[in-house]
């Protein structure tokens, strides 16, 4: 990081500072997700069609009040917790899912008994993927400055007290898996 600080542009230095601050937690989360992954491989789940990215930004409400799920480019066969993490854990720092929204979702989705270990695993994977990709975008000198600024703001949101990284850490704490 010292080399980055001495020779990099402002946005690379900014994201490097965030990364330095979060490095121990990122490393711990990676370790915990790896352990959960190994544990979950020993007890496979039923696979269902998952959207892969069903956050509020991928929902449309039509004039008749029907909800449409758009942007299916991340669709995958996976345990249902892969999508349920968006409703039960939330992934957008600026738009946490409320209990009323969860109730409305499950009224349409139907009864389900999600596995908290799978939820924590998928939250952790998503948090690691997001922090890595958005930090990379913020440091990418080939990107326009506005995109880099936006990426840095998203990194800040991920690491915020209500951000996805914090949610993933909380899910692991709830399981007794975060010291």
Predicted segments with their positions:
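An alpha-helical support segment within catalytic cores of ATP-dependent transferases
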Residues: 1-51, 174-176
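ATP/Mg2+ or Mg2+-diphosphate-binding catalytic cores
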Residues: 10, 132-179
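Hydrophobic alpha-helical membrane segments, chiefly transmembrane helices and signal peptide h-regions
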Residues: 26, 54, 61, 127-133
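Short, flexible active-site loops
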Residues: 7-18, 66-72, 84-90
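Active-site activation/catalytic loop segments of kinase-like enzymes and analogous catalytic loops
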Residues: 81-114, 124-142
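Hydrophobic packing residues in well-ordered alpha-helices of helical domains and bundles
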Residues: 19, 26, 124, 148-152
């Amino acid at each position: 990081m010292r080399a980055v600080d001495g020779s990099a542009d402002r946005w690379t230095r900014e994201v490097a500072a965030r990364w330095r601050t979060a490095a121990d937690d990122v490393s711990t989360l990676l370790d915990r997700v790896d352990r959960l992954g190994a544990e979950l491989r020993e007890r496979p789940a039923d696979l269902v069609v998952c959207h892969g990215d069903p956050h509020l930004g991928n929902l449309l409400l039509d004039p008749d009040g029907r909800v449409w799920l758009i942007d299916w480019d991340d669709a995958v066969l996976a345990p249902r917790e892969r999508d349920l993490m968006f409703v039960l854990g939330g992934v957008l720092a600026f738009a946490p899912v409320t209990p009323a929204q969860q109730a409305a979702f499950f009224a349409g989705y139907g009864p389900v008994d999600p596995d908290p270990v799978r939820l924590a695993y998928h939250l952790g994977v998503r948090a690691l993927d997001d922090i890595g990709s958005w930090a990379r975008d913020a440091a990418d000198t080939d990107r326009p400055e506005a995109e880099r600024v936006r990426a840095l703001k998203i990194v800040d949101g991920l690491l915020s007290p209500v951000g996805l990284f914090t949610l993933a850490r909380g899910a692991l704490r709830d399981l007794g898996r975060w010291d």
